Amino acid sequence: MSSTKHRIDLGTTYSCVGVFKNEQVDIIANDQGNRTTPSYVAFTETERLIGDARRTRWHEPPGNTVFDEAHDRPQVRRPDLQSDMKHWPFKVIVKDGKPVISVEYQNQTKTFSRGDLGYGAAENEGDGGGYLGTTVKDAVITVPAYFNDSQRQATKDAGSIAGLNVLRIINEPTAAAIAYGMDRKGDKGEKNVLIFDLGGGTFDVTLLTIESGVFEVKATAGDTHLGG
């Protein structure tokens, strides 16, 4: 197995990719030179645009631009989904009992699940090979702490479809704690750590302990509509 691994953060508003190499993490710039990529996927008559590419095409129909996908809800009748749908420019419909997104793509009406769209973002963020000069396939993908099993599996599937070997799906606050602990390997005894993860659209708080390199989550809570 390669000793170099991706760490991909598919966020609500921005996504980024880091590479763990030589005991440290480097955040990789995208093809626009930015270290974070807008979490947008847009569809035109001829192509699919991801991230910064969508921002340069501001004149494209907003109904074909999908965002806010970290707010994945598997049940279409949930009040929070119904509320969000009033503000989204894109259309959400029911297919096989689950909400999917309907867009006009290549002159056809097509539907995509969150996993389908996550694949595009993962594929875009997974391109660390150009930075390293070698192919990197192993990846760890972080998700909000409140994600359930089906949401985590959808994220893992998206990475696999993008050609990545997804080693683990871990909570974003846990990833932050691991990064904190990496710089304090010499610390003795048990430490209590409180992680505040305020993102562009979600908020998580996690309480955990660190002792001898072992991380144990004691409690976690969050708000899926608090961020900015």
From Swiss-Prot:
GO terms for molecular function: ATP binding; ATP-dependent protein folding chaperone. SUPFAM superfamilies: Actin-like ATPase domain. Residues 57-80 are annotated as: Disordered. It comes from the Eukaryota. Residues 68-80 have a biased composition (Basic and acidic residues). Keywords: ATP-binding, Nucleotide-binding, Stress response. InterPro entries: ATPase_NBD (IPR043129), Heat_shock_70_CS (IPR018181), Hsp_70_fam (IPR013126). The keyword Ligase does not apply. The keyword Cytoplasm does not apply. PANTHER family: HEAT SHOCK PROTEIN 70KDA. Belongs to the heat shock protein 70 family. This is Heat shock 70-related protein 4. It comes from Leishmania major. The lineage of its organism: Eukaryota, Discoba, Euglenozoa, Kinetoplastea, Metakinetoplastina. The gene is HSP70.4.
